[in-house]
Curated annotation (Swiss-Prot):
Gene3D superfamilies: 1.10.287.3440, 1.20.58.930, Alanine racemase, Lyase, Ornithine Decarboxylase, Chain A, domain 1. Keywords: Decarboxylase, Lyase, Magnesium, Metal-binding, Polyamine biosynthesis, Pyridoxal phosphate, Spermidine biosynthesis. Belongs to the Orn/Lys/Arg decarboxylase class-II family. SpeA subfamily. Its cofactor is Mg(2+); pyridoxal 5'-phosphate. The keyword Metal-binding applies. Substrate binds at V281, D282, I283, G284, G285, G286, L287, G288, V289, D290, Y291. This is Biosynthetic arginine decarboxylase. It catalyses: L-arginine + H(+) = agmatine + CO2. It holds the Pfam family Arg_decarb_HB. One of its GO terms (biological process) is arginine catabolic process. The modification N6-(pyridoxal phosphate)lysine is found at K99. The keyword Plastid does not apply.
Length: 630
């Protein structure tokens, strides 16, 4: 058998599929990141080792701002190419919806690099609007205001507009339009009004119901006519500058996007024919990320189109309908936050220990006085072959069930139960191995690989770092960052360190269907074993919660230059004291309470003075330490 090669690992984990030129494997068998086009790479294993020397413990979130820059450039260049190809005469504006990742360093990097690319920000709530107005200092960039609005929200936006901000208030419900009219009159400002239209078209994938008739936001055709009449009656006809639609996040099929664009383009035409000179068409989000690298519309974690195809269809549809009707090309706004941010963050954590189902030692023989069920099961295992495996499987299941029943009634002892378990799982392993080599294996054996997978216990919280994996079964690319020149001989599911049975990952990307285990290597005592979760830059940080009071992880900003990489910033993860404070425990009061209790215990002779000091020292250091295992 030939030696395992790096190319085998590339195929096994499909890194060339989902890595989109950012992630690959080097000759040392380590995952490397290539954030920019100049080819400078970052070896993740070397980076993690250096961070460990700096006392930065895993789990850690690595952010690569150069990837953010590259994503902005990529999207902008796609629009430029499409504009030239289709004769597009208006402007394109890339808008970043900060709900995707509101972390200040992320937003500031996007604003800083996006200035020359017409990049603006979107706010979907009052707190987000406060952030957006303050950080977006470029008066030429757009601010789009979505979400539900009250008077204070609208007043803040209108006053910011009055001071020079290019702000668009997008009407989600009819009552918002009335509030905008009222506040605009009070403040003596001509508002930039947008209207979100509820299309009949919907997206595809997990967020399909975000669009279409069942969508949460937007005006129906009847409500739109009512809104137009209202604006005309209030002298606001010239204030309608923008129409907006959104058919859902992570749209998997380009055909759904094309259908929505055709429908929305007719609203643009109809409004112009009615004398409403709309200047902007905001086509919303939906531009997907190929999480599994299959480029398949059948997978909820993939998309069957490229950024260029998405942009080509957007521009060509609106150019075509505008030219046919003799109206100006609209300025096109895109809100593609997921596509901008997903690739720039990588979560790294260490495997702490493993658990494997028991198996029978080949050298072990059955004692003459062993229970008859043990002897029967041993005989099945000893004579197992391909011709007998289905019958053997049925017999083994029956014997195990009988043994468990007898144990529950106190008839079979613990030693016998343990022997039954080891023999049963050894039979299961051997049957799975035989079935794996068959072209047409019995259906009963399909789930055996999942059943037999090891458990790898990892130092992270699924709920804090990968909430979409738990909440909506989102599949992220996961693989080791080292030893990729070695064949992974184990199969495992991943378990986090929360005290919750839901804290596990049992679905992984595969070039065929979803896999229920991850190929991994056996642990070595001499070195830590790290796994990485990729494409986690969108939504995960902000949606994460503190289940079991596991807080934010350490975060590291890594940039590249011609000499290599540079660790720009290390942001410490939350301490135990910080997360306790969130749930209204005062750390200082906790320490005082413990000091009183320890003093009392020392006086009563329960512990010595030195033991009391040691306990308090451990408590204080733990209180101001990392919430994860160190």
């Amino acid at each position: 058998m030939r030696k395992w090669r790096i190319e085998d690992s590339e195929e096994l984990y499909n890194i060339t599929g989902w890595g989109t030129s950012y992630f690959s494997i080097n000759d040392a068998g380590h995952v490397v990141v290539t954030p920019r086009r100049d080819g400078v790479t970052v070896d993740l294993k070397e980076l993690v080792d250096e961070l460990q020397l700096r006392d930065v413990a895993s789990p850690m979130l690595l952010r690569f701002p150069d990837i953010l820059d590259n994503r902005i450039e990529k999207m902008s260049s796609c629009f430029k190419q499409a504009a030239e190809e289709y004769g597009y005469k208006a402007e394109n504006f890339i808008i970043y919806p900060i709900k995707v990742n509101q972390m200040r360093p992320v937003v500031e990097e996007i604003i800083s690099h996006g200035k020359k690319f017409n990049l603006g920000l979107e706010a979907g709530s009052k707190p987000e609007l406060h952030a957006v107005i303050a950080v977006n200092t470029d008066s030429d960039s757009l601010i789009v205001c979505n979400g539900y609005k009250d008077e204070s929200y609208i007043e803040l936006a209108l006053l910011a507009q009055k001071m020079g901000k290019r702000i668009f208030l997008v009407v989600e419900k009819m009552n918002e339009l009335k509030l905008i009219a009222k506040m605009a009159k009070q403040l003596n400002v001509q508002p930039n009004i947008g209207i979100r239209i509820k299309l009949a078209s919907s997206g595809s994938g997990k967020w399909e119901e975000s669009g279409g008739d069942a969508s949460k936001f937007g005006l129906t055709s009847s409500e739109l006519l009512e809104a137009l009449d209202f604006m005309e009656s209030k002298g606001l006809k010239d204030c309608l500058k923008l129409i907006h639609f959104h058919i859902g996040s992570q749209v998997t099929k380009i055909r759904r996007i094309k259908t929505a664009l055709r429908e929305a383009s007719q609203f643009y035409v109809q409004l112009h024919s009615m004398g409403f000179n709309v200047e902007f068409v905001d086509i919303g989000g939906g531009l997907g990320v190929d999480y599994d690298g299959t480029r398949s519309s059948n997978s909820e974690g993939s998309v069957n189109y490229s950024i260029q195809e998405y942009v080509n269809d957007s521009i060509s549809t609106l150019v075509d309908v505008s030219d046919k009707n003799g109206i100006p090309h609209p300025n096109i706004i895109t809100e593609s936050g997921r596509a901008l941010t997903a690739h720039h963050s990588v979560l790294i954590f260490e495997v702490l220990e493993t658990a494997t189902l028991p198996e029978w030692d080949d050298e072990e023989e059955i004692a003459p006085d062993a229970h008859e069920l043990v002897q029967e099961l041993y005989s099945i295992w000893d004579s197992l072959n391909q011709n007998k495996m289905l019958e053997a499987w049925h017999d083994a299941q029956q014997i195990r069930e009988e043994a468990l029943d007898l144990f529950s009634h106190g008839i079979v002892d613990l030693k016998t139960r343990a022997q039954i378990e080891r023999l049963y799982w050894s039979i299961t392993r051997e049957i799975n191995q035989i079935a794996g080599g068959l072209k047409h294996a019995p259906d009963e054996f399909r789930g055996l690989s999942k059943l037999l997978a090891d458990k790898y216990f990892c130092n992270f919280s699924l709920f804090q770092s990968l909430p979409d994996s738990w909440a909506i079964d989102q599949i992220f690319p996961i693989m080791p960052i080292q030893r990729l020149d070695e064949k992974p001989e184990r199969s495992a599911t991943l378990q986090d360190i929360t005290c919750d049975s839901d804290g596990k990952i049992a679905n992984f990307i595969s070039t065929r269907n979803v896999a229920h285990y991850l190929p991994v290597h056996s642990l070595k005592k001499t070195e830590p074993y790290y796994l990485a979760v990729f494409l986690v830059g969108a939504y995960q940080e902000i949606l994460g919660d503190m289940h079991n009071l596991f807080g934010d992880t350490n975060a590291v900003h890594v940039s590249v230059n011609e000499k290599g990489y540079n660790i720009e910033q290390i942001i410490d993860g939350e301490t135990v004291a910080e997360v306790l404070d969130y749930v209204q425990y005062n750390p200082k009061k906790l320490v005082r309470t413990l000091e009183t209790w320890v003093t009392k215990s020392v006086k009563e002779g329960k512990i010595s003075l030195e033991e009391g000091k040691e306990f308090l020292s451990n408590y204080r250091s733990g209180l101001y330490g990392y919430t994860y295992l160190e």
